[in-house]
A protein has these predicted regions:
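Conserved acetyl-CoA-binding loop-helix of GNAT-fold acetyltransferases
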Residues: 75, 81-94, 121
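Conserved GNAT acetyl-CoA-binding A-motif
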Residues: 96-108
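Charged catalytic carboxylate motif
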Residues: 9-12, 87-88, 114
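Acetyl-CoA-dependent GNAT
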Residues: 4-72, 95, 99, 127-128, ...
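Residue-level recognition of the GNAT/N-acetyltransferase active site
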Residues: 6, 76, 80, 109
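Conserved acetyl-CoA-binding loop of GNAT-fold acetyltransferases
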Residues: 120-129
């Protein structure tokens, strides 16, 4: 079952993130407070996948009024290759469409072979015509990668 994510899901979603090799978790943005702030700003667009009462997948999804963005798209390794990821993406995009968002993007690490193959398989286009820039406003927001 795919449903909207709520802050009550945080502990289970965070535990899922911690299980995934190579997953980058930010100390502030991905804290309970950070995710709660994100969900308050985007109350309808983030989703979880639930199997037998257990959260096995999640997407943080939001928008700025113009473009949507997917973050932390993941499915527990034991549940992959069953359409869960695709179904979560479809649900998140339906919610974006309902809010009149016409385009959605995401960032995937270049070394994330599984993720990059997934996005190609479900019809997403890899952009080759732009550069991605960022500027850190809070140095305390450290990213740690799971091993």
């Amino acid at each position: 079952m795919i449903r909207r994510m709520t802050i009550e899901d945080y502990d289970d979603v965070h535990a899922l993130w911690m299980k995934i090799k190579g997953f980058g978790i930010r100390s502030i943005d991905d804290s309970r407070e950070g995710v709660e702030r994100f969900l308050k700003r985007n109350p309808t667009t983030s989703v979880v996948a639930v199997e037998d009462g257990t959260i096995v997948g999640s997407i943080l999804c939001g928008h700025d009024g113009r473009r949507g963005c997917l973050y932390h798209v993941c499915v527990d390794e034991a549940y992959r290759m069953h359409g869960i990821g695709r179904n979560m993406v479809v649900k998140a995009m339906e919610e974006l469409k309902a809010e009149h968002i016409n385009k959605v993007s995401l960032i995937a690490f270049t070394k994330n072979d599984i993720g990059n193959a997934f996005w190609k398989e479900i019809g997403w286009t890899k952009r080759e015509d732009l550069n991605y820039y960022e500027f850190t406003l809070n140095e305390a927001n450290i990213t740690a990668f799971n091993r």
